[in-house]
Curated annotation (Swiss-Prot):
Domain of life where this protein originates: Bacteria
Gene Ontology BP terms: glutathione biosynthetic process
EC number: 6.3.2.2
InterPro entries found in the cross-reference section: Gln_synth/guanido_kin_cat_dom, Glu_cys_ligase, Glut_cys_ligase
Keywords associated with the record: ATP-binding, Glutathione biosynthesis, Ligase, Nucleotide-binding
Keyword ATP-binding recorded: yes
EC category: ligase
UniProt GO molecular function: ATP binding; glutamate-cysteine ligase activity; metal ion binding
Name of the molecule in the record: Glutamate--cysteine ligase
Pathway per the UniProt entry: Sulfur metabolism; glutathione biosynthesis; glutathione from L-cysteine and L-glutamate: step 1/2
Catalytic activity: L-cysteine + L-glutamate + ATP = gamma-L-glutamyl-L-cysteine + ADP + phosphate + H(+)
Length: 527
Protein backbone atom coordinates (compact mmCIF):
# COMPACT_ATOMS: atom_id res chain seq x y z
CA UNK A 1 0.00 0.00 0.00
CA UNK A 2 1.32 3.44 -0.93
CA UNK A 3 2.08 5.74 2.00
CA UNK A 4 0.84 9.18 0.95
CA UNK A 5 1.75 12.66 2.14
CA UNK A 6 -1.76 13.02 3.59
CA UNK A 7 -1.29 9.86 5.66
CA UNK A 8 2.12 11.00 6.87
CA UNK A 9 0.72 14.41 7.80
CA UNK A 10 -2.10 12.72 9.72
CA UNK A 11 0.41 10.63 11.68
CA UNK A 12 2.57 13.70 12.22
CA UNK A 13 -0.44 15.60 13.57
CA UNK A 14 -0.98 12.87 16.14
CA UNK A 15 2.65 13.21 17.27
CA UNK A 16 3.03 16.99 16.89
CA UNK A 17 4.53 17.24 20.38
CA UNK A 18 7.67 15.62 18.96
CA UNK A 19 8.27 18.79 16.94
CA UNK A 20 9.37 20.46 20.18
CA UNK A 21 12.50 18.27 19.78
CA UNK A 22 13.41 19.76 16.40
CA UNK A 23 17.01 20.95 16.59
CA UNK A 24 18.40 23.82 14.57
CA UNK A 25 21.76 25.58 14.56
CA UNK A 26 23.38 28.36 12.55
CA UNK A 27 26.83 29.00 11.10
CA UNK A 28 27.00 32.62 9.97
CA UNK A 29 29.95 33.86 7.95
CA UNK A 30 31.10 37.46 7.71
CA UNK A 31 34.21 39.22 6.45
CA UNK A 32 36.15 41.43 8.82
CA UNK A 33 36.66 44.81 7.16
CA UNK A 34 38.41 48.02 8.18
CA UNK A 35 36.64 51.36 8.65
CA UNK A 36 36.77 51.95 4.88
CA UNK A 37 35.14 48.62 4.05
CA UNK A 38 38.35 47.00 2.83
CA UNK A 39 39.07 43.36 3.71
CA UNK A 40 41.03 43.27 6.97
CA UNK A 41 44.60 42.07 6.61
CA UNK A 42 45.02 41.56 10.36
CA UNK A 43 45.39 38.20 12.06
CA UNK A 44 42.39 36.52 13.67
CA UNK A 45 41.85 38.58 16.86
CA UNK A 46 43.49 37.03 19.91
CA UNK A 47 40.40 37.74 22.00
CA UNK A 48 38.44 35.30 19.83
CA UNK A 49 40.76 32.45 20.74
CA UNK A 50 42.06 29.82 18.36
CA UNK A 51 40.04 29.44 15.16
CA UNK A 52 40.95 25.74 15.09
CA UNK A 53 39.37 24.86 18.42
CA UNK A 54 36.88 27.57 19.47
CA UNK A 55 33.36 26.16 19.20
CA UNK A 56 31.78 29.63 18.98
CA UNK A 57 33.96 31.61 16.55
CA UNK A 58 36.19 30.23 13.82
CA UNK A 59 37.24 31.21 10.31
CA UNK A 60 36.14 29.89 6.96
CA UNK A 61 38.34 30.35 3.89
CA UNK A 62 40.20 33.53 4.72
CA UNK A 63 41.82 34.69 7.92
CA UNK A 64 39.38 37.60 7.63
CA UNK A 65 36.26 35.46 7.04
CA UNK A 66 34.70 34.94 10.45
CA UNK A 67 32.29 32.10 11.08
CA UNK A 68 30.03 32.47 14.10
CA UNK A 69 28.59 29.16 15.28
CA UNK A 70 25.65 28.48 17.56
CA UNK A 71 24.87 25.35 19.47
CA UNK A 72 21.69 23.44 18.66
CA UNK A 73 18.40 24.82 19.95
CA UNK A 74 14.83 23.60 20.27
CA UNK A 75 13.44 27.14 19.82
CA UNK A 76 14.19 29.82 17.24
CA UNK A 77 14.27 32.67 19.75
CA UNK A 78 17.01 31.06 21.84
CA UNK A 79 18.91 30.15 18.66
CA UNK A 80 18.97 33.75 17.45
CA UNK A 81 19.62 34.96 20.98
CA UNK A 82 22.85 32.98 21.03
CA UNK A 83 23.81 34.21 17.56
CA UNK A 84 23.18 37.79 18.70
CA UNK A 85 25.25 37.26 21.85
CA UNK A 86 28.15 35.88 19.82
CA UNK A 87 28.04 38.92 17.56
CA UNK A 88 28.04 41.17 20.62
CA UNK A 89 31.05 39.36 22.06
CA UNK A 90 32.94 39.58 18.77
CA UNK A 91 32.25 43.30 18.55
CA UNK A 92 33.62 43.68 22.06
CA UNK A 93 36.89 42.25 20.76
CA UNK A 94 37.17 43.86 17.31
CA UNK A 95 39.10 47.11 17.22
CA UNK A 96 38.50 49.45 14.30
CA UNK A 97 36.84 46.70 12.26
CA UNK A 98 33.33 45.70 11.24
CA UNK A 99 31.64 42.49 10.18
CA UNK A 100 30.58 42.95 6.54
CA UNK A 101 26.87 42.17 6.62
CA UNK A 102 26.56 41.13 2.98
CA UNK A 103 27.13 37.86 1.16
CA UNK A 104 29.01 39.45 -1.72
CA UNK A 105 32.43 40.65 -0.58
CA UNK A 106 33.74 44.00 0.51
CA UNK A 107 36.64 45.69 -1.27
CA UNK A 108 39.27 43.00 -1.73
CA UNK A 109 43.03 43.42 -2.07
CA UNK A 110 44.81 41.87 -5.05
CA UNK A 111 44.20 38.12 -5.23
CA UNK A 112 47.68 37.27 -3.96
CA UNK A 113 47.15 39.42 -0.86
CA UNK A 114 43.91 37.80 0.34
CA UNK A 115 45.07 35.95 3.48
CA UNK A 116 44.25 32.25 3.77
CA UNK A 117 43.05 31.19 7.22
CA UNK A 118 45.77 29.99 9.57
CA UNK A 119 45.13 27.34 12.23
CA UNK A 120 48.54 26.85 13.79
CA UNK A 121 51.19 24.21 13.20
CA UNK A 122 49.41 21.06 14.37
CA UNK A 123 48.72 18.42 11.75
CA UNK A 124 44.99 19.09 12.11
CA UNK A 125 45.51 22.80 11.61
CA UNK A 126 47.86 22.37 8.67
CA UNK A 127 45.38 20.03 6.96
CA UNK A 128 42.75 22.78 7.06
CA UNK A 129 45.24 25.38 5.83
CA UNK A 130 46.60 23.29 2.95
CA UNK A 131 43.05 22.40 1.88
CA UNK A 132 42.39 26.13 1.58
CA UNK A 133 45.59 26.59 -0.43
CA UNK A 134 44.17 23.99 -2.77
CA UNK A 135 40.92 25.93 -3.10
CA UNK A 136 42.96 28.98 -4.10
CA UNK A 137 44.76 26.98 -6.79
CA UNK A 138 41.53 25.51 -8.13
CA UNK A 139 39.01 28.35 -7.89
CA UNK A 140 40.91 31.49 -6.96
CA UNK A 141 40.71 33.35 -3.67
CA UNK A 142 38.14 35.96 -4.65
CA UNK A 143 35.29 33.47 -4.95
CA UNK A 144 36.13 32.01 -1.55
CA UNK A 145 35.35 35.35 0.11
CA UNK A 146 31.63 34.99 -0.60
CA UNK A 147 29.74 34.54 2.68
CA UNK A 148 26.45 32.96 3.66
CA UNK A 149 24.29 31.58 6.44
CA UNK A 150 24.19 27.82 6.95
CA UNK A 151 21.10 26.47 8.69
CA UNK A 152 21.40 23.06 10.33
CA UNK A 153 18.18 21.14 10.95
CA UNK A 154 17.27 17.80 12.46
CA UNK A 155 14.13 15.97 13.52
CA UNK A 156 14.09 13.51 16.45
CA UNK A 157 14.41 9.80 15.70
CA UNK A 158 10.93 9.21 17.11
CA UNK A 159 9.52 11.45 14.38
CA UNK A 160 11.33 9.53 11.63
CA UNK A 161 9.74 6.39 13.09
CA UNK A 162 6.39 8.05 12.39
CA UNK A 163 7.29 9.35 8.92
CA UNK A 164 9.26 6.36 7.56
CA UNK A 165 7.76 3.33 9.32
CA UNK A 166 8.67 0.78 6.64
CA UNK A 167 12.47 1.08 6.94
CA UNK A 168 14.01 -1.71 9.05
CA UNK A 169 16.15 0.21 11.57
CA UNK A 170 16.20 3.65 13.21
CA UNK A 171 19.33 4.52 11.21
CA UNK A 172 17.71 3.45 7.95
CA UNK A 173 14.52 5.39 8.74
CA UNK A 174 16.50 8.51 9.54
CA UNK A 175 18.78 8.33 6.50
CA UNK A 176 15.97 7.50 4.09
CA UNK A 177 13.90 10.35 5.51
CA UNK A 178 16.66 12.94 5.18
CA UNK A 179 17.50 11.88 1.62
CA UNK A 180 13.79 12.17 0.75
CA UNK A 181 13.80 15.64 2.33
CA UNK A 182 16.84 16.60 0.22
CA UNK A 183 15.08 15.53 -3.00
CA UNK A 184 12.13 17.78 -2.21
CA UNK A 185 14.44 20.58 -1.13
CA UNK A 186 16.14 20.28 -4.52
CA UNK A 187 12.75 20.54 -6.24
CA UNK A 188 11.50 23.53 -4.29
CA UNK A 189 14.54 25.49 -3.06
CA UNK A 190 14.03 28.00 -5.87
CA UNK A 191 11.30 29.37 -3.59
CA UNK A 192 13.81 30.10 -0.82
CA UNK A 193 15.94 32.03 -3.30
CA UNK A 194 12.98 34.12 -4.41
CA UNK A 195 11.83 34.85 -0.87
CA UNK A 196 15.18 35.35 0.87
CA UNK A 197 17.82 35.96 -1.81
CA UNK A 198 19.57 39.19 -0.83
CA UNK A 199 22.44 39.50 -3.29
CA UNK A 200 21.28 41.13 -6.54
CA UNK A 201 24.34 43.39 -6.82
CA UNK A 202 28.07 43.33 -6.19
CA UNK A 203 31.21 45.43 -6.41
CA UNK A 204 32.56 45.68 -9.96
CA UNK A 205 36.02 44.59 -8.87
CA UNK A 206 34.67 41.22 -7.75
CA UNK A 207 34.44 40.31 -11.43
CA UNK A 208 37.94 41.57 -12.23
CA UNK A 209 39.42 39.78 -15.20
CA UNK A 210 36.35 37.61 -15.82
CA UNK A 211 33.71 37.68 -18.52
CA UNK A 212 30.17 38.29 -17.33
CA UNK A 213 26.74 39.48 -18.44
CA UNK A 214 26.03 41.76 -15.50
CA UNK A 215 24.70 45.26 -16.02
CA UNK A 216 26.14 48.50 -14.65
CA UNK A 217 24.19 50.20 -11.87
CA UNK A 218 26.86 52.80 -11.15
CA UNK A 219 30.60 53.04 -11.93
CA UNK A 220 31.51 50.65 -9.10
CA UNK A 221 28.40 48.43 -8.91
CA UNK A 222 27.25 45.58 -11.14
CA UNK A 223 23.85 43.92 -10.89
CA UNK A 224 21.06 42.09 -12.66
CA UNK A 225 17.71 43.91 -12.51
CA UNK A 226 15.62 40.87 -11.50
CA UNK A 227 18.29 38.83 -9.69
CA UNK A 228 17.64 37.43 -6.24
CA UNK A 229 21.04 35.91 -5.40
CA UNK A 230 24.11 36.37 -7.56
CA UNK A 231 25.94 34.47 -4.82
CA UNK A 232 24.07 31.30 -5.73
CA UNK A 233 24.41 31.84 -9.48
CA UNK A 234 27.21 30.49 -11.65
CA UNK A 235 29.16 33.77 -11.49
CA UNK A 236 31.75 32.60 -9.04
CA UNK A 237 31.32 28.87 -9.00
CA UNK A 238 32.21 27.90 -12.53
CA UNK A 239 34.47 24.87 -12.46
CA UNK A 240 34.75 22.13 -15.06
CA UNK A 241 35.69 19.42 -12.60
CA UNK A 242 32.69 20.05 -10.33
CA UNK A 243 30.24 20.81 -13.14
CA UNK A 244 30.44 17.18 -14.26
CA UNK A 245 29.51 15.91 -10.80
CA UNK A 246 25.88 14.82 -10.67
CA UNK A 247 25.45 13.34 -7.23
CA UNK A 248 22.52 10.99 -6.70
CA UNK A 249 19.84 11.84 -4.15
CA UNK A 250 17.76 8.69 -4.65
CA UNK A 251 19.51 6.83 -1.84
CA UNK A 252 22.37 7.42 0.56
CA UNK A 253 24.56 4.57 -0.71
CA UNK A 254 24.63 5.86 -4.27
CA UNK A 255 25.16 9.44 -3.10
CA UNK A 256 28.15 8.38 -1.02
CA UNK A 257 29.47 6.15 -3.80
CA UNK A 258 29.57 9.04 -6.26
CA UNK A 259 31.10 11.36 -3.69
CA UNK A 260 33.74 8.70 -3.00
CA UNK A 261 34.57 8.58 -6.71
CA UNK A 262 35.00 12.36 -6.76
CA UNK A 263 37.45 12.40 -3.83
CA UNK A 264 39.48 9.51 -5.26
CA UNK A 265 39.48 10.23 -9.02
CA UNK A 266 42.47 12.25 -10.33
CA UNK A 267 41.70 15.32 -12.43
CA UNK A 268 44.23 16.22 -15.16
CA UNK A 269 44.25 19.97 -14.51
CA UNK A 270 44.94 19.39 -10.82
CA UNK A 271 47.57 16.78 -11.61
CA UNK A 272 49.31 19.45 -13.67
CA UNK A 273 49.41 21.70 -10.59
CA UNK A 274 50.76 18.95 -8.32
CA UNK A 275 50.62 18.84 -4.54
CA UNK A 276 53.81 20.78 -3.82
CA UNK A 277 55.54 23.91 -5.00
CA UNK A 278 59.00 24.92 -3.82
CA UNK A 279 58.82 22.20 -1.20
CA UNK A 280 55.51 23.46 0.24
CA UNK A 281 52.16 21.68 0.15
CA UNK A 282 49.72 23.54 -2.13
CA UNK A 283 46.83 21.04 -2.20
CA UNK A 284 45.99 17.82 -0.38
CA UNK A 285 45.77 15.74 -3.57
CA UNK A 286 45.04 16.09 -7.28
CA UNK A 287 41.59 14.51 -7.28
CA UNK A 288 38.31 16.05 -8.49
CA UNK A 289 37.67 16.97 -4.85
CA UNK A 290 40.43 17.19 -2.24
CA UNK A 291 37.94 16.28 0.49
CA UNK A 292 34.17 15.88 0.74
CA UNK A 293 33.51 19.46 1.88
CA UNK A 294 34.81 20.81 -1.41
CA UNK A 295 31.62 19.68 -3.15
CA UNK A 296 29.47 22.76 -3.60
CA UNK A 297 25.74 22.25 -3.05
CA UNK A 298 22.74 24.08 -1.63
CA UNK A 299 22.06 21.35 0.95
CA UNK A 300 24.17 18.55 2.45
CA UNK A 301 23.42 15.43 4.46
CA UNK A 302 25.63 15.63 7.55
CA UNK A 303 26.99 13.52 10.39
CA UNK A 304 29.32 14.73 13.14
CA UNK A 305 32.80 13.28 12.70
CA UNK A 306 35.63 12.42 15.05
CA UNK A 307 39.19 13.66 14.62
CA UNK A 308 40.62 12.35 11.33
CA UNK A 309 37.31 10.63 10.50
CA UNK A 310 36.07 11.18 6.96
CA UNK A 311 32.50 12.45 6.40
CA UNK A 312 31.79 9.71 3.83
CA UNK A 313 32.80 7.03 6.32
CA UNK A 314 30.79 8.58 9.16
CA UNK A 315 27.67 8.82 6.98
CA UNK A 316 28.08 5.28 5.66
CA UNK A 317 28.59 3.76 9.11
CA UNK A 318 26.16 5.81 11.22
CA UNK A 319 23.76 7.38 8.73
CA UNK A 320 22.54 10.94 8.27
CA UNK A 321 22.25 12.97 11.48
CA UNK A 322 20.98 16.31 10.12
CA UNK A 323 20.88 18.46 7.00
CA UNK A 324 22.81 21.65 6.37
CA UNK A 325 20.99 24.24 4.26
CA UNK A 326 23.68 26.28 2.50
CA UNK A 327 21.81 28.54 0.08
CA UNK A 328 20.67 31.31 2.45
CA UNK A 329 22.25 34.69 1.78
CA UNK A 330 23.20 36.95 4.65
CA UNK A 331 20.22 39.19 5.34
CA UNK A 332 21.83 42.65 5.14
CA UNK A 333 18.88 44.26 6.92
CA UNK A 334 19.30 42.17 10.09
CA UNK A 335 22.30 42.59 12.45
CA UNK A 336 22.63 38.81 12.91
CA UNK A 337 22.28 38.10 9.18
CA UNK A 338 19.08 36.06 9.55
CA UNK A 339 15.71 36.91 11.09
CA UNK A 340 13.45 34.80 13.30
CA UNK A 341 10.80 35.01 10.59
CA UNK A 342 13.18 33.47 8.04
CA UNK A 343 14.26 30.73 10.44
CA UNK A 344 10.67 29.76 11.21
CA UNK A 345 9.73 29.62 7.55
CA UNK A 346 12.76 27.44 6.82
CA UNK A 347 11.69 25.09 9.64
CA UNK A 348 8.20 24.72 8.15
CA UNK A 349 9.62 24.41 4.63
CA UNK A 350 11.97 21.60 5.69
CA UNK A 351 9.22 19.76 7.58
CA UNK A 352 7.09 19.98 4.44
CA UNK A 353 10.02 18.61 2.41
CA UNK A 354 10.41 15.74 4.89
CA UNK A 355 6.74 14.77 4.82
CA UNK A 356 5.63 15.46 1.24
CA UNK A 357 5.69 12.85 -1.49
CA UNK A 358 9.24 12.74 -2.83
CA UNK A 359 9.48 10.64 -6.00
CA UNK A 360 12.89 9.43 -7.05
CA UNK A 361 14.76 11.50 -9.59
CA UNK A 362 15.62 9.87 -12.96
CA UNK A 363 17.87 6.81 -12.95
CA UNK A 364 21.01 8.90 -12.63
CA UNK A 365 19.57 10.43 -9.46
CA UNK A 366 19.98 14.01 -10.65
CA UNK A 367 17.18 16.43 -11.56
CA UNK A 368 18.28 18.84 -14.28
CA UNK A 369 14.84 20.48 -14.30
CA UNK A 370 15.20 21.48 -10.65
CA UNK A 371 18.72 22.78 -11.25
CA UNK A 372 17.45 24.87 -14.16
CA UNK A 373 14.58 26.34 -12.10
CA UNK A 374 16.99 27.27 -9.32
CA UNK A 375 19.45 28.84 -11.78
CA UNK A 376 16.84 31.02 -13.46
CA UNK A 377 15.35 32.26 -10.17
CA UNK A 378 18.68 33.38 -8.72
CA UNK A 379 19.38 35.44 -11.86
CA UNK A 380 15.90 36.71 -12.79
CA UNK A 381 13.44 35.47 -10.19
CA UNK A 382 11.50 38.76 -9.99
CA UNK A 383 11.15 39.15 -13.76
CA UNK A 384 7.49 39.77 -14.67
CA UNK A 385 6.01 36.78 -16.45
CA UNK A 386 8.91 34.46 -15.57
CA UNK A 387 7.90 30.83 -16.05
CA UNK A 388 9.40 27.77 -14.38
CA UNK A 389 9.26 24.14 -15.44
CA UNK A 390 7.08 21.98 -13.18
CA UNK A 391 7.14 18.38 -14.39
CA UNK A 392 7.27 19.57 -18.00
CA UNK A 393 4.54 22.21 -17.60
CA UNK A 394 5.22 25.95 -17.58
CA UNK A 395 4.08 27.68 -14.39
CA UNK A 396 4.61 31.22 -13.11
CA UNK A 397 6.61 31.98 -9.98
CA UNK A 398 3.62 33.50 -8.10
CA UNK A 399 1.27 30.64 -8.97
CA UNK A 400 3.67 27.85 -8.02
CA UNK A 401 4.87 29.81 -5.02
CA UNK A 402 1.36 30.29 -3.63
CA UNK A 403 0.55 26.62 -4.23
CA UNK A 404 3.68 25.64 -2.30
CA UNK A 405 2.79 28.00 0.54
CA UNK A 406 -0.66 26.39 0.67
CA UNK A 407 1.09 23.03 1.08
CA UNK A 408 3.56 24.35 3.66
CA UNK A 409 0.87 26.07 5.76
CA UNK A 410 -0.26 22.89 7.59
CA UNK A 411 3.34 22.29 8.71
CA UNK A 412 3.67 25.85 9.99
CA UNK A 413 0.42 25.21 11.88
CA UNK A 414 1.89 22.04 13.41
CA UNK A 415 4.87 23.99 14.74
CA UNK A 416 2.52 26.58 16.23
CA UNK A 417 0.45 23.75 17.73
CA UNK A 418 3.54 22.18 19.28
CA UNK A 419 5.24 25.37 20.47
CA UNK A 420 2.23 27.61 21.13
CA UNK A 421 1.42 30.96 19.56
CA UNK A 422 1.16 31.86 15.88
CA UNK A 423 4.73 32.86 14.99
CA UNK A 424 5.05 30.20 12.29
CA UNK A 425 1.77 31.19 10.64
CA UNK A 426 2.90 34.82 10.69
CA UNK A 427 6.21 33.89 9.08
CA UNK A 428 4.39 32.11 6.29
CA UNK A 429 1.95 34.99 5.76
CA UNK A 430 4.86 37.39 5.27
CA UNK A 431 6.10 35.25 2.39
CA UNK A 432 2.72 35.39 0.64
CA UNK A 433 3.05 39.15 0.48
CA UNK A 434 6.39 38.82 -1.31
CA UNK A 435 4.82 36.65 -4.01
CA UNK A 436 2.09 39.24 -4.55
CA UNK A 437 4.47 42.20 -4.36
CA UNK A 438 7.99 41.38 -5.60
CA UNK A 439 9.17 44.80 -4.37
CA UNK A 440 8.91 43.41 -0.83
CA UNK A 441 11.59 40.77 -1.44
CA UNK A 442 14.98 41.52 0.12
CA UNK A 443 16.67 41.51 -3.29
CA UNK A 444 14.28 44.20 -4.54
CA UNK A 445 14.69 46.19 -1.34
CA UNK A 446 18.49 46.19 -1.71
CA UNK A 447 18.29 47.45 -5.29
CA UNK A 448 15.71 50.08 -4.32
CA UNK A 449 18.01 51.34 -1.56
CA UNK A 450 20.93 51.61 -4.00
CA UNK A 451 18.85 53.50 -6.57
CA UNK A 452 16.94 55.76 -4.20
CA UNK A 453 20.03 56.64 -2.21
CA UNK A 454 22.15 57.03 -5.35
CA UNK A 455 24.76 54.99 -3.52
CA UNK A 456 27.17 52.24 -4.56
CA UNK A 457 26.96 48.65 -3.33
CA UNK A 458 30.14 49.23 -1.33
CA UNK A 459 29.00 52.41 0.40
CA UNK A 460 25.51 51.05 1.11
CA UNK A 461 26.92 47.84 2.59
CA UNK A 462 29.52 49.64 4.68
CA UNK A 463 26.90 52.01 6.09
CA UNK A 464 24.61 49.10 6.99
CA UNK A 465 27.47 47.17 8.58
CA UNK A 466 28.46 50.20 10.65
CA UNK A 467 24.90 50.74 11.83
CA UNK A 468 24.52 47.08 12.79
CA UNK A 469 27.84 47.28 14.65
CA UNK A 470 26.68 50.36 16.54
CA UNK A 471 23.40 48.65 17.48
CA UNK A 472 25.19 45.54 18.74
CA UNK A 473 27.83 47.51 20.64
CA UNK A 474 25.07 49.56 22.27
CA UNK A 475 23.87 46.34 23.92
CA UNK A 476 26.98 44.95 25.62
CA UNK A 477 26.83 41.44 26.98
CA UNK A 478 26.24 40.80 30.68
CA UNK A 479 29.53 40.24 32.48
CA UNK A 480 28.91 36.53 33.02
CA UNK A 481 28.24 35.93 29.30
CA UNK A 482 31.36 37.88 28.34
CA UNK A 483 33.34 35.83 30.84
CA UNK A 484 32.00 32.57 29.40
CA UNK A 485 32.99 33.53 25.85
CA UNK A 486 36.40 34.73 27.03
CA UNK A 487 36.98 31.49 28.92
CA UNK A 488 36.03 29.45 25.84
CA UNK A 489 38.54 31.52 23.85
CA UNK A 490 41.29 30.88 26.43
CA UNK A 491 40.54 27.16 26.49
CA UNK A 492 40.66 27.03 22.69
CA UNK A 493 44.18 28.47 22.70
CA UNK A 494 45.26 25.87 25.26
CA UNK A 495 43.65 23.10 23.20
CA UNK A 496 45.41 24.23 20.01
CA UNK A 497 48.73 24.21 21.88
CA UNK A 498 47.98 20.72 23.21
CA UNK A 499 47.34 19.48 19.67
CA UNK A 500 50.56 21.04 18.43
CA UNK A 501 52.55 19.39 21.21
CA UNK A 502 50.91 15.98 20.91
CA UNK A 503 51.42 15.29 17.19
CA UNK A 504 53.26 11.98 16.93
CA UNK A 505 53.87 11.92 13.15
CA UNK A 506 55.02 14.44 10.56
CA UNK A 507 52.53 16.19 8.28
CA UNK A 508 53.24 14.02 5.23
CA UNK A 509 52.42 10.91 7.25
CA UNK A 510 49.33 12.56 8.72
CA UNK A 511 47.98 13.40 5.26
CA UNK A 512 48.59 9.81 4.16
CA UNK A 513 46.70 8.55 7.23
CA UNK A 514 43.86 10.98 6.52
CA UNK A 515 43.48 9.72 2.97
CA UNK A 516 43.71 6.11 4.16
CA UNK A 517 40.89 6.73 6.64
CA UNK A 518 38.50 7.05 3.70
CA UNK A 519 36.61 3.79 3.25
CA UNK A 520 34.68 2.80 0.15
CA UNK A 521 31.06 3.28 1.27
CA UNK A 522 29.42 0.91 -1.18
CA UNK A 523 29.69 -2.21 1.02
CA UNK A 524 27.78 -0.27 3.69
CA UNK A 525 24.34 -1.50 4.73
CA UNK A 526 23.04 1.99 5.51
CA UNK A 527 20.16 3.03 3.28
Amino acid sequence: MTDTAAQRHHRLQAHADLLTQTLRGIEKEGLRVDHQGVLARTAHPAGLGAALTNAHVTTDYSEALLELITGTHTEVDSLLGELRDTHRYVYGVLEGEYIWNQSMPATLPPEADIPIAWYGTSNTGMLKHVYRRGLAERYGKTMQCIAGVHYNFSLPDALWDVLVPDAPTPQARRSRGYISLIRNFTRYSWLLMYLFGSAPALAREFMRGRDHLLETLDPSTLYLPYATSLRMSDLGYQNKAQSRLKLCYNDLDTFLGRLYEAVTEPWPAYQAIGTRRDGQWIQLNTNVLQIENEYYSSIRPKRATGRCERPITALAERGVQYVEVRCLDIDPLTPEGISAETARFVDAFLLFCATSDSPFFPDNGYCQRSADNFAVVVKEGRKPGLMLDREGQAVSVPQWGHELLDQIAPYAALYDQALGGDAYAAALAAQRAKLDQPDLTPSARVLAALREGNVSFHDYSLDLSRRHADALRAQPLPAERTQAYAEAARQSVAEQLRLEQSDAVDFDTYVAHYHAALKNPLPSTAS
